[in-house]
């Protein structure tokens, strides 16, 4: 699961491309009762939130590559597992991505949610730029990662992002 400021990408190891790519947004109805008879939900995620944005208040739980709203991020992960990938997270090890300067407390919170909320059997958090470099068959190099909310230039040596 690649958590981006603008888009979330998710899929399975071994696949050539993500199975799901959708906006990293959570929307809630601006007014109660506006959507009467439409089976109104208390929140919408991704493409559904985008398509109903006219009557919703949209929130972006990832700002500049860093998760800032954990309740909404949990909704995005729930949507990823159950609606997009259609898997039981307790049956699959999970690989999550993070920004190069993601605070340690954030990584700990991601881990806690995966184990305690989604009962994931195993997980790993990897820096996005390192995974991009791996995809090119290299372990040492420099990656320019230009995303929707933040861009990073990341020097990587033998698989480790160098702080600079």
Swiss-Prot record:
Its EC number is 3.6.4.-. Oxidation of Met-35 to form methionine sulfoxide promotes actin filament depolymerization. Methionine sulfoxide is produced stereospecifically, but it is not known whether the (S)-S-oxide or the (R)-S-oxide is produced. The keyword Membrane does not apply. SUPFAM superfamilies: Actin-like ATPase domain. It catalyses: ATP + H2O = ADP + phosphate + H(+). InterPro entries: Actin, Actin/actin-like_CS, Actin_CS, ATPase_NBD. The modification Methionine sulfoxide is found at residues 35, 38. Signal peptide: none annotated. SMART domains: ACTIN (SM00268). It is an enzyme of class 3 (hydrolase). It is found in: Cytoplasm, Cytoskeleton. One of its GO terms (cellular component) is cytoskeleton. Its main location: cytoplasm. Keywords: ATP-binding, Cytoplasm, Cytoskeleton, Hydrolase, Nucleotide-binding, Oxidation. It comes from the Eukaryota. Transmembrane segments: none annotated. GO terms for molecular function: ATP binding; hydrolase activity. It holds the Pfam family Actin. Actins are highly conserved proteins that are involved in various types of cell motility and are ubiquitously expressed in all eukaryotic cells. Belongs to the actin family. This is Actin.
């Amino acid at each position: 699961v690649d958590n981006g400021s603008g888009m979330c990408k998710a899929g399975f190891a071994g696949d050539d491309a993500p199975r799901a790519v959708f906006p990293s947004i959570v929307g809630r109805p601006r007014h109660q009762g506006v959507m009467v008879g439409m089976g109104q939900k208390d929140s919408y995620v991704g493409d559904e939130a985008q398509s109903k944005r006219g009557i919703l208040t949209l929130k972006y739980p990832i700002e500049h590559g860093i998760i800032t709203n954990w309740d909404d991020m949990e909704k995005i992960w729930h949507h990823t597992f159950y609606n997009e990938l259609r898997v039981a997270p307790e049956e699959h090890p999970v690989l999550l991505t993070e920004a190069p300067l993601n605070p340690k407390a954030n990584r700990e919170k991601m881990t806690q949610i995966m184990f305690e909320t989604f009962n994931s059997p195993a997980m790993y958090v990897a820096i996005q730029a390192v995974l991009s470099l791996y995809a090119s068959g290299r372990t040492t190099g420099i990656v320019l990662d230009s995303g929707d909310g933040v861009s990073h230039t990341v020097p990587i040596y033998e698989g480790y992002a160098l702080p600079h």
